[in-house]
């Protein structure tokens, strides 16, 4: 009897140990739909969205890449061979693409994927205040960035997921939040400390290849990838510095590696490479708005001014009107229509618009806080006044006619164009497929909506 009890106890201990080892082993295995080939230098979060529909599995693929701060003329200036080759084999904008105002990173990245001007999708700056919420948004605040209630519109990844198509988004602004009821099936969390490391650069390519190697029911058909260079170098050293030129060629080499990797998959992939804005050498010291007006009664975020009193708005507007020539001041409702920046209270009121590459802010830091001069390179300006703000556009693939060039166009028009290539029905947007329809093999037939209703 004692021997039997000892046997049972031994069996139980062995079984528990075996189960623990098995559980540990299972935890290290990829979940269904995952790949064991993902590069851990850029961890991906997997959301359990429904598999690709039969309709989605028949569609082509689009890989959208953004090179932050890659000015419209960098490729030709620095002989970026891979980007120029992409343009020769497909389409490009030799004179650049027009960013939306303000020509800043978060507003324009979200414009590219929603087709909405910043005043309509809500990201009116990289950082701003919302009077209705009595809260601030900042691109450096993880809590705000991952809160989908800040964003309006249906980004391409939400559009795809809502119509039965998987998407994978690698570091694109806005992709860490649930927006329009969806998250991308795959996404990566942004880590400013590591995202530009050589390991993270290689991981982008490795993970795209691994994603495209998934089974058809799991494979994403829309992939978006964000790179922070050459924006950093442009800010720190200026757009014409040797360091910036080196970063331009570095990113061109990354595009070359990505293109070669995509070609090896044998899939029908349209590769689209854009930037969010350009870069210009800043002129002069900070322009502090409180040097020209008494901002008592105002909150401020950067150059954006917020007051609860209409009397304060009128007073400061009249004071700023008499100011120096480096900016023009408007009441919010009177901001010129061509800027598409006169409807959203998040933009502040009054609104100061720089007339050149001048660094504007409400006021210097409070006493005791460190102040810094403006960065050597800057952006955020109206491209009509500062043409260096123009962005880049290159694309090639089975849906794109070769040897095409396009005149400068507004970046809101990318959204319906990419949606068309994926056969998606676009959400309401400020763009038009007609602008880029002539670059498509099918000439944009059967759109503005979509070529066939997904089922």
Regions found by a protein language model. Name each.
Residues 44, 55-57, 198-213, 230-271, ...:
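A long, amphipathic alpha-helix that forms part
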Residues 321-323, 329-347, 424-453:
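Polar, surface-exposed loop/tail segments
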Residues 1-11:
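N-terminal secretory signal peptides that target proteins for export/translocation
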Residues 153, 298-405, 409-420:
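Active-site neighborhoods of enzymes that stabilize oxyanions during catalysis
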Residues 14-27:
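Bacterial N-terminal signal peptides
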């Amino acid at each position: 009897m004692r021997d039997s009890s000892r046997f049972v106890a031994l069996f139980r201990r062995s079984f528990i140990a075996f189960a623990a080892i098995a559980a540990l082993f299972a935890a290290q295995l990829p979940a269904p739909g995952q790949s064991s080939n993902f590069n851990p230098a850029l961890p991906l979060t997997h959301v359990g969205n429904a598999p690709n529909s039969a309709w989605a599995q028949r569609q082509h693929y689009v890989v959208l890449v953004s090179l932050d701060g890659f000015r419209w003329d960098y490729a030709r200036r620095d002989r970026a061979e891979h980007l120029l080759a992409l343009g020769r084999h497909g389409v490009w904008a030799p004179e650049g693409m027009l960013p939306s105002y303000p020509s800043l990173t978060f507003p324009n990245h979200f414009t590219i994927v929603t087709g909405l001007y910043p005043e309509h999708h809500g990201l009116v700056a990289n950082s701003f205040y919302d009077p209705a919420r009595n809260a601030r948004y900042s691109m450096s605040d993880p809590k705000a960035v991952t809160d989908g209630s800040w964003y309006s519109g249906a980004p391409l990844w939400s559009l795809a997921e809502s119509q039965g198509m998987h998407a994978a988004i690698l570091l694109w602004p806005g992709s860490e939040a649930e927006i329009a009821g969806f998250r991308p099936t795959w996404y990566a969390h942004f880590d400013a400390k590591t995202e530009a490391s050589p390991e993270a650069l290689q991981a982008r390519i490795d993970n795209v290849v691994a994603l495209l190697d998934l089974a058809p029911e799991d494979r994403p058909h829309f992939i978006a990838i964000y790179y922070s260079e050459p924006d950093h170098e442009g800010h720190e050293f200026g757009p014409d510095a040797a360091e910036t030129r080196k970063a331009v060629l570095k990113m061109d080499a990354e595009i070359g590696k990505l293109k070669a990797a995509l070609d090896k998959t044998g899939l029908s992939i349209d590769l689209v490479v854009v930037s969010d804005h350009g870069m210009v050498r800043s002129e002069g010291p900070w322009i502090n708005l409180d040097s020209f007006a008494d901002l008592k009664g105002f909150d401020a975020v950067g150059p954006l001014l917020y007051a609860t009193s209409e009397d304060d708005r009128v007073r400061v507007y009249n004071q700023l009107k008499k100011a120096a020539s480096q900016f023009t001041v408007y009441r919010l409702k009177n901001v010129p229509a061509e800027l598409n920046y006169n409807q959203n209270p998040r933009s502040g009121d009054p609104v100061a618009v720089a007339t050149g590459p001048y660094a504007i802010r409400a006021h210097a830091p409070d006493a005791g806080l460190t102040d810094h001069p403006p960065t050597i390179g800057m952006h955020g300006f109206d491209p009509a006044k500062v043409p260096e703000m123009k962005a880049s556009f290159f694309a090639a693939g089975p849906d794109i006619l070769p040897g095409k060039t396009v005149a400068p166009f507004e970046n809101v028009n990318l959204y319906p164009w990419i949606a068309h290539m994926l056969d998606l029905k676009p959400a309401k947007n400020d763009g038009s497929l007609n602008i880029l329809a002539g670059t498509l093999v099918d000439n944009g037939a059967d759109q503005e909506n979509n070529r066939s209703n997904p089922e």
